[in-house]
Amino acid sequence: MGHLPQSLYSAAGPKFPYPGSSGLGVDQRKLTWSRFPVFLRCASTESLTSLTQNNAAEIELKYLVSQHGWDVRRLNRDDEDEIRRVSLVQAEAFHIPLALFDDFFFMFFQAEVLSALLYKLKNSPPDRYACLVAEQTSETETLSSSSVVGVVDVTAQTESSVLRYFPGVEEYLYVSGLAVSKSQRRKKMASTLLKACDVLCYLWGFKLLALRAYEDDAAARNLYSNAGYSVVETDPLWTSTWIGRKRRVLMSKRFS
């Protein structure tokens, strides 16, 4: 099992700063290595069931998914620079710019994101939480932590507010914190990250993925719909009257 760099080990457990949103620049307001890491060159029609025929040949391969010019793998817990890079990608995606002292507040926001990431890496079993990172496919260069330009979190959960819609299901994987660097958006990286979540769901033996998006974030909802997610519920109307609160939709994707 991997470990965190000693200099990053003492992290508090803050509330994660961006529940139910995606860092795709549309609306800025959920294994150490798996025992079965998969290198999957995905076609749009390829199903997860095909993986059962190839596990033996794929056990030693590094990436969960490789498509559209992106490779997706698990975050390297031993790489302090990579951990900080991931927190920067997420902070830049979810930070809401301010008119005054923006740099100052961004610094604190990034520190909060980093603290939340460290807490989850330190306290979550390796088969219950994974931070997946995307980097550009390169066959000639050695990629460094600075090459990480996309990230998504996947966490095993048992919230009754979600499971009540799925009788017989005891737990699910929650997808959150999907973030893509501004310079790399509209290049199908987010779709590739979501495909990696599908693969991880299969490898861990789960049958259900869930996530939340803002109701008025059409781009994010279209992304999730195209990835196979469907709306399960929408927040009640009265929630939109709360100051600073926007209505969200719960979306899910189920595997047979």
Swiss-Prot record:
Tissue: Expressed in green tissues.
UniProt GO molecular function: N-acetyltransferase activity
Annotated organelle transit peptide span: 1-41
Top EC group: transferase
Entry keyword Amino-acid biosynthesis: no
Biological process terms in GO annotation: N-terminal protein amino acid acetylation; peptidyl-lysine acetylation
InterPro entries: Acyl_CoA_acyltransferase (IPR016181), GNAT_dom (IPR000182), N-term/lysine_N-AcTrnsfr (IPR051556)
Entry-linked Pfam families: Acetyltransf_1
Free-text description of this protein's post-translational modifications in UniProt: Autoacetylated.
GO CC, alphabetical: chloroplast
Localization terms from the record: Plastid, Chloroplast
Chief subcellular location: plastid
Binding positions (acetyl-CoA): 178-180, 186-191, 217-219, 224
Catalytic activity entry: an N-terminal L-alpha-aminoacyl-[protein] + acetyl-CoA = N-terminal N(alpha)-acetyl-L-alpha-aminoacyl-[protein] + CoA + H(+); L-lysyl-[protein] + acetyl-CoA = N(6)-acetyl-L-lysyl-[protein] + CoA + H(+); N-terminal L-methionyl-[protein] + acetyl-CoA = N-terminal N(alpha)-acetyl-L-methionyl-[protein] + CoA + H(+); N-terminal L-seryl-[protein] + acetyl-CoA = N-terminal N(alpha)-acetyl-L-seryl-[protein] + CoA + H(+)
Record has Plastid as a keyword: yes
Transmembrane segments: none
EC number: 2.3.1.255, 2.3.1.48
Residue positions of the active site: 224
Main function: Protein acetyltransferase with dual specificity triggering both N-alpha-acetylation (NTA), with a preference for leucine, methionine, serine, valine and to a lower extent threonine and alanine as substrates (can also use glycine), and epsilon-lysine acetylation (KA) of several plastid proteins.
Family according to the record: Belongs to the acetyltransferase family. GNAT subfamily.
Subunit structure: Oligomer.
Protein name as annotated: GCN5-related N-acetyltransferase 10, chloroplastic
Source organism of the structure: Arabidopsis thaliana
